[in-house]
Amino acid sequence: MIGPNGAGKSTVLKSIAKQLSPLEGTIRIGGESLDEIHGDALARKMAVVFTERIHSELMTCEDVVATGRYPYTGKFGILSKADYRVVDEAMRLVHVEELKGQNFAKISDGQRQRVMLARALAQEPEILLLDEPTSYLDVKYKLEFLTVLQEMTRKKKLTVIMSLHELDMAQRISDRILCIGRSHCVEKFGRPEKIFTSGYIRRLFGMTAGNFDEGSGMMELEGPKGRPEVFVIAGNGTGRHVFRKLQRSGIPFVTGILYRNDIDYPTAEALAVQVIASEAFEEVPEEQIREARQWMDRCDRVICCRENFGTWDRANAALRTYAKESGKL
């Protein structure tokens, strides 16, 4: 699930988890009404990891994960050797074995999030509900966390329903995307390739600044405005770091000549005052070369990110020569 803050993503998850009563309609799991599933039967079907902190006194991380087995233990809550094997496997899957004997209350937020996922996996549910599960994780554990979820959906047929703010992650990992808008209603539901278009994402989140690149799922900040001071000769991925450095410095720039399928093009389109772009696999027209020279003449200096130019890139090689002769390179 994706959508702006306050749209109702957490409300949907809490309704599915029976923490909130739906105002209308019926939630069904495998055709059975959620109202008819209670207690341990529900806990064996569904596990939940929400953003609210749990307060545990004098519990080790293993103790917390072991609570995921209680739907299977009966009235006395005694874990068998088989239960502990499930606990150990769940902790191994999310890489928290080394935290086994540590006090749960004293570990970091990121570690706590991983322990809570291990607890949910120890329940061996059919459905796993997650509310912004990667909020406290660094990039290493974020990738490992999502990889584990993906493996569980494939190998154990686990259904995962989660809210995510990282659009690039949602685009890469999800089979289906549910979009909840500012009107607290479902706006769209479908495959990521149908949802993640620049125009729709801007509308969904009410973006008035910056840009969304549908190819990478990444956001770009607003580019600097005003008279261009720098002309950048880029291409083949050599220009992106320069574009962003100029943006951070607040320096307006022009770039070209870029093919529209070049990896530099989306970043240039988002940040540059002007992009001189040519159609892919076509020879650059002479009028575009003249246009690039005119922009060069207006700029104070030229940055060339390229060292080598191929057969199809003679136009940019000529621009570098022109910049040198003009004393701007």
Which residues are covered by each model-predicted region?
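Catalytic Walker B motif of ABC-type/P-loop ATPase nucleotide-binding domains
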Residues: 128-132
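Helix-to-loop junction immediately C-terminal to a conserved catalytic motif
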Residues: 17
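Conserved ABC ATPase "signature" region
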Residues: 66, 81-100
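Conserved switch/coupling elements of ABC/ABC-like ATPase nucleotide-binding domains
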Residues: 33, 178, 182-194
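ABC ATPase nucleotide-binding domains
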Residues: 205-286, 304-306, 310-313, 329
